[in-house]
Amino acid sequence: MAQKINITNIPARRPFGRRRKVDPFTGQHAQEIDYKDVKMLQRYISEKGKIVPSRITAVNLKNQRKLAQAIKRARMLALIPFEVK
């Protein structure tokens, strides 16, 4: 006959999906957002020169605003181009 299934013996399943990325600008060893650090800013600019959205880079809202401001400031000082051809 059928055996009774004990719910306590069934292992818990992990939820399906990807893990949330960690914001690189938070934590103890986080780097500062600086408009003069062109190499760091280039990682958050697409191939066409647009600012990459936070849903892709996993930067939180507060740091995304700082990052966008730093990129715009670097563009005004001609450290990085406005658009890439």
Swiss-Prot record:
One of its GO terms (biological process) is translation. GO terms for cellular component: cytosolic small ribosomal subunit. It comes from the Bacteria. InterPro entries: Ribosomal_bS18, Ribosomal_bS18_CS, Ribosomal_bS18_sf. Keywords: Ribonucleoprotein, Ribosomal protein, RNA-binding, rRNA-binding. GO terms for molecular function: small ribosomal subunit rRNA binding; structural constituent of ribosome. Binds as a heterodimer with protein bS6 to the central domain of the 16S rRNA, where it helps stabilize the platform of the 30S subunit. Belongs to the bacterial ribosomal protein bS18 family. NCBIfam families: S18. Part of the 30S ribosomal subunit. Forms a tight heterodimer with protein bS6. This is Small ribosomal subunit protein bS18. It comes from Hyphomonas neptunium (strain ATCC 15444).
